[in-house]
Amino acid sequence: MKGYMEDREHEKSLQAEKEELKEVSVSYGHEVKLSNLFPTRFGHKNYQHTFEGMDHGRHVHAHGNKMQQLADVFFFRDALRPGSVITPTIPPTTSLPAFLPRHVADAIPFSADRFADVLAMFAPASLAMAREIRWALDTCGQRAAALLPGEKAGCATSLESLADLAASLLGTRDVRAFSAADLPTDAATTPARRGRYNVTSVRELSAMAGSGSSSSSEPAPAAVVACHDLTYPYAVFYCHSTKPTAAYAVTLVAATTGDGDGEGEAASPAKMEALAVCHLDTSRWRADNPFFVAHGVKPGEVSVCHFLTKLSIVWVPRHEQGGPRAAA
């Protein structure tokens, strides 16, 4: 996804467009101005960018502490066993704007080519809001060009289109959806959640889907679709599916009590039910991924996992749900 090095010329362009659109009002058949309907989430750091390291096809523009933060997002798959101790990084969740009805969402422009029209609908738009809107539009419109082989992706702007997209990516409408609904909802300025936790149970959501190729007796991992909420004036999700991938429901119990693991970090709940996704084939990831650099490993040598946010959704075919994972 987007790097940490901001393009100053792009910022100037956004600022110019924002100035031009301050007094613009666009009607799309609704009496109520859309900018009055939705709470905004643009006054705080967008923790979607914490997962820059998950966009494995691009160079990571980060240095020093930022590189360490990206490295901390990931962990080895072996840690997902009862009895292990883990220090998860789970980006905070504030709130998700409401989904629009499908007929309304489909009538609203949603593309980088219509960026000026989109901004006009939410005028007056701050520069931060304009940047996040543009980033979401670019993610949904241009991300396909940077997909890894075998990866599929798309964006959904309504609840109905979200279900349809997941079914399309999985190739079946008989699906199950999982989310970490019990994770806390945080204040807008809350940093990433950290803390030492005991892994007490791990349940695989994506079972092995039959046998593998004719040349191997190993089972082939089932399809998994992960959907991540984007910062936007109304609910928008970016969904993608990459094989081979495994998804887990993980119960975490605090190994220590009190505040966060470091200065300014969120207080650690005593217990969390979280979702984790593991990428089983990292051979096509960049060698400069912060996790690889921090641990001295190369692409393809290890499976890499990360936790999902409260609002992220994991979809799997209904008949492929797995069971508990054994302790080491």
Curated annotation (Swiss-Prot):
Disulfide bonds: none annotated. InterPro entries: BURP, BURP_dom. PROSITE patterns: BURP. Pfam families: BURP. This is BURP domain-containing protein 11. Residues 74-318 form the BURP domain. It comes from Oryza sativa subsp. japonica. Expressed in roots.
